[in-house]
């Protein structure tokens, strides 16, 4: 019996795959539990159109991510002022939210905090640090962060 998988199954395949399985397995397990549907002509056409649409969306997301990286590549380094204690250690830390906010201000594009990845955890010391800006899992760029002491006069 021919079926279309609605979700990824370890022993069978990925979502959207068209497979032949034993009819009892399909009727008694896959279809009643919502893991597959019968592979009729209409369902096959629908799945093919759905896959094409998902591929177009993926290409669009990747192109948007690449344009974001190009805009950020023009920024040499980002200076973030922070309150500093003894021996250059920060009060608190500079997190992904702070870096995303500063990058958004400098590049005029919206950057979400989950697009920032740290190489060694949150930044807790004054100095030069590197973080990864990753708007899509296949597109990333390394960004220089310079944390400086905030003036106490303000």
Curated annotation (Swiss-Prot):
Domain of life: Bacteria
Name under which the protein is recorded: Large ribosomal subunit protein bL9
GO process terms (BP): translation
UniProt keyword Chaperone, yes or no: no
Function, in words: Binds to the 23S rRNA.
GO molecular function, one term: structural constituent of ribosome
Family (UniProt): Belongs to the bacterial ribosomal protein bL9 family.
Keyword field contains RNA-binding: yes
Pfam family, one: Ribosomal_L9_N
GO cellular component: ribonucleoprotein complex; ribosome
């Amino acid at each position: 019996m021919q079926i279309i998988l609605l979700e990824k199954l370890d022993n069978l395949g990925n979502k959207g795959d068209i497979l032949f399985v034993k009819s009892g397995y399909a009727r008694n397990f896959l279809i009643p539990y919502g893991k597959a549907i019968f592979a009729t002509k209409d369902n096959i056409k629908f799945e093919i159109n759905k896959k094409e649409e998902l591929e177009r969306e993926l290409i669009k997301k990747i192109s948007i991510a690449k344009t974001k990286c190009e805009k950020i590549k023009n920024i040499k380094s980002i200076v973030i002022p922070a309150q500093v204690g003894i021996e250059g250690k920060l009060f608190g830390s500079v997190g992904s939210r702070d870096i995303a906010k500063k990058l958004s201000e400098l590049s005029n594009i919206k950057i979400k905090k989950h697009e920032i990845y740290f190489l060694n955890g949150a930044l807790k010391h004054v100095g030069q640090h590197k973080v990864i800006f990753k708007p899509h899992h296949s597109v990333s760029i390394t960004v220089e962060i310079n944390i400086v002491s905030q003036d106490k006069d303000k």
